[in-house]
Amino acid sequence: MKALALAAGLIGMAFAATAAEHRIVIDGMAFTPKLVSARPGDTITWVNKDMFVHNVTAAAAGFKSGDLKPGQSWRHVLRQGESFDYLCTLHPVMTGRVEVGDTIKTARRRSTS
């Protein structure tokens, strides 16, 4: 039983060590960058640097940040197969996309070579 707990802990540590942080800035009535490529376990943080209240809503992924006042931020940890489009429901012209997968970055590098 102890060996199983140790193995689970080591796997969790390895997973956490490879997870990345991605930052999306909300400013000028836009999300920047508009497209983020990430892996399962990565964290996306949206930071509101605009002078208006915004939110981050992804119906397909089943989340809504709630209202983010200027200076506030919100985080979401990505799961496998969780690519999604999102928007600010207060300002629907503000949109973005997060693509989640282990091979996204590799495939993009190959296509630009």
Predicted regions, residues:
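Extracytoplasmic copper-binding redox domains, predominantly the cupredoxin/blue-copper superfamily
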Residues: A17-S113
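Hydrophobic h-region of N-terminal signal peptides that target proteins for export
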Residues: A8-T18
